[in-house]
C-alpha cells in the first residue's frame, strides 16, 4: 500500500501532537502576573496533586509582597472543557483565609482549603485567579489547570 506525502505528513503531525500535548494528570499552574505586580509567587502547591470530587483541595502559597495590602478584591474565572462556567468577584480580606492588612515582606499560607463539590463533573478545569489591591492595582495573577476525577 502506497501513502501520499500528505498522508505521511498528517501521521507524523498526529504523533507529534500525542507526544507534545500530554494530558493534565495533576494540578499545573503558571504565573500570569505583570512584572509590576506587588506579589511575586515563589511556591504554589496543591494537595492532593490529583483533585477528586467530594474532597478538599488544600492550596499552599508563598512569596514576597513588596507593599502592604489594606484591602482588595479577588476575581475568579473557571472554565470546564473550554466552556466558561463561573465568574466570581469577592473581597480579598473576607472569607479567603486572609486578614488585612497584609504586611509587606515574605508571605506564606497553607490555610486555603477549597472543597470540591461531590457532584462536579469529571474533566479538565482552567482557573484564572487575579487579585487587586486598595489602589485597584493588580497584586498577582495565576492560571491553574487541573483534571478533577471522581472517587
From Swiss-Prot:
The record's listing under Gene3D superfamilies reads: 2.60.40.770
Q: What is this protein called?
A: Putative phosphatidylglycerol/phosphatidylinositol transfer protein 3
Q: How does it assemble?
A: Monomer.
Q: Which organism is it from?
A: Dictyostelium discoideum
Protein function: Catalyzes the intermembrane transfer of phosphatidylglycerol and phosphatidylinositol.
Q: What is the lineage of its organism?
A: Eukaryota, Amoebozoa, Evosea, Eumycetozoa, Dictyostelia
Family that this chain belongs to? Belongs to the NPC2 family.
Specify whether Zinc is a keyword of the entry: no
> What Pfam families is this protein classified in?
E1_DerP2_DerF2
Query: Where does the record locate the signal sequence feature?
Result: 1-26
UniProt-recorded Gene Ontology molecular function terms: sterol binding
Q: Which UniProt keywords apply?
A: Lipid transport, Signal, Transport
Q: Name one GO biological process term.
A: sterol transport
